[in-house]
Amino acid sequence: MRNSWLGAGVFAAGLGLAMILACGGLSSAGPAATASPAFWKVWGDGKAELSGYAITTTRYGVPREGRVVLIYVTEPMDRRNWIKDDAGDVPIEERVNVLKLNNVLKFQTGIYPYSVMTSVFAPVDTLAAERFAPAKIAMGAQEWCGLVYEKVIPAPQAFTSELRSYFHAEGDRDATVKTPPGTLYEDALLIQLRELDGPFARGKSWAGSIVPSLWSQRKGHTALGPVAATIKREDATRDGLPVTRFTLSYGSVVTTYDVEKAAPRRVLGWKTSGGDEAKLLKTTRLPYWQLNAPGDEKYLKELE
């Protein structure tokens, strides 16, 4: 992973966004607005923000204790395939700067562990109705029975999905699912609700369609598709800190997210009607991809 080029030079890359076509949920008219200098002052520093959480999550009808790490970092991607521009040689008109979120969940079920990672790639410039609309979402889940991988590519009025599963009933499946204009994706809310470069839903409550998280659909073995939803916002406090509380509701599902009002506007925790509850432990900024030498395990203490 290389992010050292980000910074002042990143504004030049934004010029290429005007040539983006209507794919991956992005507007063919190019960016309505580019990310602000204040955004890049934080997110162009060549580091990632890492936040560790303690979580209780329900699996097989039983509460399980686990850990979540949310990893936020900016990086360049090739819009032609939504793969990272590792070599730095993608033509500028094809390069899109994204804020990537890796949501890593680990917990134990009896003898065997679960490891789930969901990656969200959200262009930092305004290319859709809502800021940080995802261009790509991918989820991988591993446990001793086998593994599952699913990828979703949003488009303005549909999304395409690829599912690769060890379950015979699912197997390998590709699909295109229609979505109403302005559809949100639950997996991207942990970026969007932080309001890192402007208010979510213009600072108001929201109503529309949302695609539930890939992991929630994985657990329920249900088809992925848009559902009617609302997101209510209100002022609240959490452990004495002022927060914006967002309440997502669709069907019988209710999830609340508490986002601190002060910078860096971290997600202090969330709670679901299904029994999940996460609480922030610590946050740090590190170039984690460089910390792979023996002894670098010490940095894990910055997340506990």
Question: Which residues are covered by each model-predicted region?
Answer:
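Acidic, serine/threonine-rich low-complexity disordered tracts
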Residues: 30-162, 198-304
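Signal peptide processing junction and immediate N-terminal pro/mature segment
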Residues: 22-31
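Positively charged n-region of N-terminal signal peptides that target proteins for export
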Residues: 1-4
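Surface-exposed beta-loop interaction hotspot
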Residues: 156-157, 163-199
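Bacterial N-terminal signal peptides
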Residues: 9-22
